[in-house]
Amino acid sequence: LALDLGTTGNRAFLFDNSGNVISQAYQELTQYYPQPGWLEHNPLEIWQATCTVMQKAIQQAKIKATDIQAIGLTVHRETCLLWDKTTGQPLHNAIVWQDRRTAFHCQKLQEQGYAEEIFVRTGLIIDAYFSATKLTWLLEQVVKPSSINLDNVLDGTIDSWILWNLTGGKVHATDDSNASRTMLYNLTTREWDTKLLDLFNIPAHLLPKIQPTLGYFGTTKPDLLGAEIPITAILGDQQASLFGHGCDRPGLVKCTYGTGSFLVARTGNNIIHSQQQLIATIAWTQNNSNDTTKVGYALEGSMFTTGACIQWLRDGIGLIDNAAQTEMLAQQVSDNGGVYFVPALSGLGAPHWDMNARGAFFGITGGVKRQHLVRSVLEAIAFQVKEVVQAINDSGLLQVERLKVDGG
């Protein structure tokens, strides 16, 4: 049973022993925008949707829970929350990876000269995208003004929250791939970095235990599905895509087109600190039989709004009725009519990392039609990916040998 917990919805897939999908289920998630630039999810809705898709997939497959050999979990990364370990209740909505509320905090850290140290320790560029400043905000804005006892609080990314619920509160853990996206994880030691915990004022006891990506994370509580099913893999969604494409050596690269687009290049056993504004991250880790851990690294270019731009064309300004319409409209004109779109609806990610950038259309004249605007948005998505591929090649440390593509 594979659980794919995405930004816009949760999916469950059941595979047979030959790797064929025998059933699947999907449930959309509500997106909450309390202020411009903010995005939240209801953690209880995420958990309930997870339960729903698991049960639907099992029912559709007409199997028993005892037939399921193992559960694997992949999640959208960086999104994080706090919850009460006694009641199991979230203390606030989860702050989603696209949320920009902590941009000012990030700018302050840059001005104070922390950029290089954080880059060396974590492989990441200071940005509101990552979890650290989100957790600081939650502690300062939710916990500090209240009478909440910090000894009763747990924090984590979505994988930790779902794992904790799957196991009935028995396991508070994460894997290396998700931990490496928090800006609190030391990429070299593969542990929570005490200096960064102090910098972000995050008590160490709140954090989940870091475990290898492919290993043992406990079992589901018996009354959840009707059996104790072992949980044997947890990955960040983009690392899961890299694994699924078989990108197991340097030069193999994948690009996923979803809410955002994420281009990830396997770098083998080496941490590559790119000077081209790309981030270093864990690909995945695995338990060896001799109690050692096999570690793989990757280089990533994160582009925040690609599919989200198409969603905005539909829901925000009503230029299209559905996503499929974009191709038809784009093909009705021979070029973009001189119109260019900046896809910075949530700032710009790699290779620019500009939290203050905003989306814009340029080159509009009286002859521009709806088709030109739609085409310029599609072209902007392609231009972003080209920039990141070029940045990888320009690093001089890695050449893109093969690029694999998926979407969701």
Residue ranges of each PLM-predicted region?
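Short beta-strand-loop/turn "lid" adjacent to the catalytic site in phosphate-handling enzymes
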Residues: 59-97, 125-131, 163-186, 211, ...
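N-terminal glycine/serine-rich phosphate-binding loop of ATP-dependent small-molecule kinases
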Residues: 1-92, 104, 120, 225-233
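Active-site core segments that coordinate phosphate-bearing ligands/cofactors
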Residues: 1-3, 17, 103, 110-172, ...
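Short, conserved phosphate/pyrophosphate- and ester-handling motifs at nucleotide-, phospho-/glycolipid
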Residues: 42, 99, 237
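Conserved beta-strand and immediately adjacent loop positions that scaffold enzyme active sites
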Residues: 11, 79-81, 181, 253, ...
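Short linear loop/turn motifs
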Residues: 207-216, 327-331
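Short, acidic/turn-prone active-site loops that include or flank metal/cofactor-
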Residues: 27, 95-102, 260-261
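Short glycine-rich phosphate-binding loop at a beta-alpha junction
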Residues: 65-75, 153-155, 209-210, 396-408
